Amino acid sequence: MAPDEEVVDSPTGWVAKHIQEYVESGGKKGHRWQGVPTLLLTTRGRKTGTLRRTALIYGRDDGSYVVVASIGGAPKHPKWYLNLVDDPMVQLQVGPDIMSGRARTTEGDEKERLWREMASIWPQYNRYQEKTDRQIPVVVIDPV
């Protein structure tokens, strides 16, 4: 991802506002949202090639970042998740720190363990899983 590439932020109103505050403050504002840590994830659009940015709750696992592709328990995966499945190279902003990362979807015991950890941060994830037929992915992003 080139530094001069245009980035399109989430069109969802409250998410766009969150991203704007996060970016404009250099990560000083917006890193915590409703008492939980959030990061900004930038993926490359799988159809357009456009860089797309969203804000997500995150956890840590050793030196990696963990996010959940819940979209509130919607019936389909979020677009950011489909984008990183297609191209796992992403960019993160965590507070003031900006870094590149490689994303991967967890499975089996690792997914179960990280799901529990993420649900301890944001308990609504369990409700989201109950209301959808799809298995909500848990994604690990390793800084590179």
Map each language-model feature to its residues.
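Short secondary-structure boundary/capping segments
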Residues: 30-31, 57, 82
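Short hydrophobic/aromatic beta-strand or adjacent loop that forms the aromatic wall/cage
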Residues: 38, 136-138
